[in-house]
Amino acid sequence: VIRFENVSKRYDTGQEALSRVDFHIARGEMVFLTGHSGAGKSTLMKLIMLMERPSHGQVLVGGRQTNRIRGAGIAHFRRDIGVVFQNHQLLFDRSVFDNVALPLQVAGFQVGDIGRRVRAALDKVGLLHKERQNPITLSGGEQQRVGIARAVVNKPALVLADEPTGNLDPELSAEIMTLFRQFNELGTTLVIATHDIDLIGRMNKRVLSLANGRVTSGAAPGGSQ
């Protein structure tokens, strides 16, 4: 579902964030993306999301060449991707329900459909009973679960998670990873950027490692280079 072909990204400052990156992630995989701070993880995620463009090479997502997607097509492309952020990026002036409903409202869903989908997503993450609360009243782990519900409410084929457990203790981190595994078992492709080596080891999933803008291991499904 994701393929990078000889992808490099050089910023205007001269910094080369990625250099000749090649890898393939198959549909339905759950893959961890790891590497030191500044290794290129965030840049790689931004290229998948069309928040950045490669300086060289080709990025394919769902069989589509992203360099051909322009203008209004970008927003449509992003509807098929759920994103989970480390800092949640929730709106604290809206209820939990309204936060999770946002992607559906943007996509033009009917009110009845929105209600059903939001409540199903909140039920999956164990927060249906808090749909009317303000996110600021929730714990950090609960806020992250709201972020996950928002990411999956539109039933995307692909979910990207950038350091989703970065601010959580080990027990809460394990709970979040259990949620991700459950969504993966339903067929969702997941790419999770994380520094948590212990957590990765327990999950027994493929690891795509970056160092200084290059893929050092895990470039192909099955863990081979």
Q: What residues fall within each predicted segment?
A:
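Short coil-to-helix segment of the ABC ATPase nucleotide-binding domain corresponding to the Q-loop/switch region
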Residues: 94-101
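Catalytic Walker B motif of ABC-type/P-loop ATPase nucleotide-binding domains
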Residues: 159-162
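Conserved ABC ATPase signature
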Residues: 134-138, 142-144
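Conserved signature/switch motifs of ABC ATPase nucleotide-binding domains
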Residues: 133-136, 154, 186
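Helix-to-loop junction immediately C-terminal to a conserved catalytic motif
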Residues: 49
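Conserved ABC transporter NBD signature motif
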Residues: 57-66
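ABC ATPase NBD coupling module
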Residues: 66-82, 111, 183-185
